[in-house]
C-alpha cells in the first residue's frame, strides 16, 4: 500500500521537469467523476495509440496542468510509433512498448491519485486536487524521461548497426550517395548528425571504409571551417563545438591520412581548442570534460587539448 503524498510534492515538478509551477496557474477544481474520466484516458495511453489520448476540453479548463500531462503521454506514444516504423529490431520495440504499458498501468493503480476519496466536498477542494494532479504529472514526467533514455539508446544501437551493415554490404550506389552528401550537402548533413555525436563519429568512420582520401580531406576541412565559423557566445554553441572538436579528433586516431591532415591543420586545431576551452589553466577539468564527450577509448583527444593549453601557458 502506497503512503500518502506530502503537500511538498507540488514542488517536485519544478525539480524534475524545470516547469514553472505558479499558484496562479494551479487552479484544479475536479470532481471524482472527472478523475474517473482522466483515469480512463491514461489507461488508453498504455496502448501507445496516439489518437486515443484525448481529454475533454472542459477537464483541461478545470485543471490546466492536464494539458501538459496529455502532451507528455502523446509524446511518448508518438516516439514508440516512430520507433516501430523505423526500428531494425521489432523485439526491442515490443519490449519498449510493453515497458511503457506496464509503467502506465502502475500509474493507473496509484491509489493516492485515482482512488475515490470519502466525502464529495473534500474532493472538490482546490488543494487536494492540485496535489493529486501534480502527483500524476510527476509520475508521467518520470515515465517520459525513462522512455526517452531507452529510445535514445535504441537509436544509437540502430545507427551503429546501420554503419556496420553499410561497411559489410556497401554497394557502389551507397558509396556514390554518401560521397554526394558529404561533398554537396555537408552542412545540412552535419546539422542532422550533430543531434547525436556517437552517430556523427560513426558516419565519419564510415568514410574511412570508403578510403576516398580526397573526400575525407574535404570533410575534415569542412568540419574545421564549421568550427571556425561558430560564434562561441552561447552555451549551446559551446557545447556543440566541444562535441564536434573532440570527436573530430577521435576520427583521426588510427588513420594515417588523417594523421597527416592533423599535422597540416595543427594551428587551426590549436585555435579551435583555445576557442572552446579558453580556461587553459584548468587542465584537469578540461581533460575530464573531453573524456566525457568522446566516443572513442583513446587518450589522444584529451591529451591533445590539454597539451594545447599547456603550450599556450608556456608562451606567457
UniProtKB/Swiss-Prot annotation:
Q: Which GO terms describe its cellular component?
A: extracellular region
Q: What else is known?
A: Passive immunization against the protein decreases IL1B and CXCL2 expression, prevents macrophages from infiltrating the bite site, protects susceptible mice from early replication of Zika virus and ameliorates virus-induced pathogenesis. Average amount of protein per pair of salivary glands is 47 ng. Average protein concentration in mosquito saliva ranges between 0.71 to 349 uM.
Q: Where is this region: Involved in interaction with human CD47?
A: 126-316
What is its induction behaviour?
Answer: Up-regulated in the salivary glands of fully engorged blood-fed mosquitoes at 6 hours after feeding. (Microbial infection) Infection with Zika virus does not affect expression levels in salivary glands.
Keywords per UniProt: Glycoprotein, Secreted, Signal
Q: Main role?
A: Activates host neutrophils; induces expression of IL1B and CXCL2 at the bite site. Promotes activation of human CD4(+) T-cells. Inhibits phagocytosis activity of host macrophages via the interaction with CD47 receptor on their surface. Suppresses expression of pro-inflammatory cytokines, such as IFN-gamma/IFNG, IL2, TNF-alpha/TNF, IL12B, IL8/CXCL8, IL6, in host white blood cells. Reduces host polymorphonuclear neutrophil chemotaxis induced by N-formylmethionine-leucylphenylalanine (fMLF). Reduces CD11b/ITGAM expression in fMLF-induced host polymorphonuclear neutrophils.
Residue positions the entry lists as glycosylated: 169
Kindly list the places in or outside the cell where this protein is found, as annotated in its UniProt entry. Answer: Secreted
Q: What is this protein called?
A: Neutrophil-stimulating factor 1
Membrane-crossing segments per the record: none
* Subunit comment: Interacts with human CD4. Interacts with human CD47; the interaction results in inhibition of phagocytosis activity of host macrophages.
Q: In which tissues is it expressed?
A: Female salivary gland (at protein level). Saliva (at protein level). Some expression in ovary and midgut (at protein level).
Q: Which domain of life is it from?
A: Eukaryota
Query: What start and end residues bound the annotated signal peptide?
Result: 1-21
Amino acid at each position: 500500500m502506497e503512503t500518502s503524498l506530502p503537500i511538498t510534492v507540488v514542488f517536485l515538478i519544478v525539480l524534475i521537469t524545470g516547469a514553472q509551477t505558479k499558484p496562479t496557474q494551479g487552479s484544479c477544481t475536479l470532481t471524482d467523476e472527472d478523475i474517473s474520466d482522466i483515469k480512463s484516458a491514461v489507461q488508453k495511453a498504455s496502448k501507445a495509440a496516439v489518437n486515443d489520448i484525448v481529454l475533454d476540453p472542459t477537464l483541461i479548463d478545470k485543471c490546466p496542468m492536464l494539458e501538459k500531462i496529455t502532451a507528455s503521454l502523446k509524446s511518448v506514444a508518438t516516439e514508440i510509433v516512430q520507433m516501430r516504423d523505423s526500428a531494425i529490431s521489432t523485439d526491442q520495440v515490443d519490449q519498449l512498448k510493453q515497458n511503457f504499458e506496464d509503467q502506465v498501468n502502475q500509474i493507473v493503480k496509484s491509489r493516492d491519485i485515482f482512488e475515490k476519496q470519502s466525502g464529495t466536498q473534500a474532493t472538490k477542494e482546490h488543494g487536494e486536487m492540485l496535489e493529486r494532479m501534480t502527483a500524476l504529472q510527476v509520475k508521467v514526467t518520470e515515465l517520459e524521461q525513462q522512455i526517452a533514455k531507452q529510445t535514445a539508446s535504441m537509436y544509437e544501437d540502430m545507427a551503429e548497426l546501420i554503419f556496420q551493415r553499410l561497411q559489410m554490404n556497401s554497394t557502389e550506389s551507397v558509396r556514390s550517395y554518401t560521397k554526394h552528401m558529404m561533398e554537396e550537402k555537408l552542412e545540412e548533413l552535419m546539422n542532422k548528425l550533430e543531434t547525436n555525436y556517437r552517430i556523427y563519429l560513426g558516419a565519419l568512420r564510415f568514410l574511412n571504409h570508403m578510403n576516398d582520401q580526397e573526400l575525407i580531406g574535404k570533410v575534415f576541412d569542412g568540419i574545421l571551417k564549421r568550427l571556425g565559423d561558430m560564434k562561441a557566445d552561447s552555451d549551446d554553441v559551446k557545447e556543440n563545438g566541444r562535441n564536434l572538436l573532440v570527436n573530430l579528433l577521435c576520427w583521426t586516431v588510427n588513420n594515417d591520412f588523417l594523421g597527416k591532415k592533423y599535422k597540416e591543420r595543427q594551428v587551426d586545431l590549436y585555435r579551435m581548442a583555445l576557442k572552446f576551452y579558453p580556461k587553459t589553466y584548468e587542465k584537469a577539468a578540461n581533460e575530464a570534460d573531453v573524456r566525457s564527450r568522446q566516443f572513442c577509448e583513446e587518450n589522444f583527444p584529451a591529451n591533445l587539448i590539454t597539451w594545447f593549453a599547456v603550450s599556450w601557458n608556456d608562451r606567457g
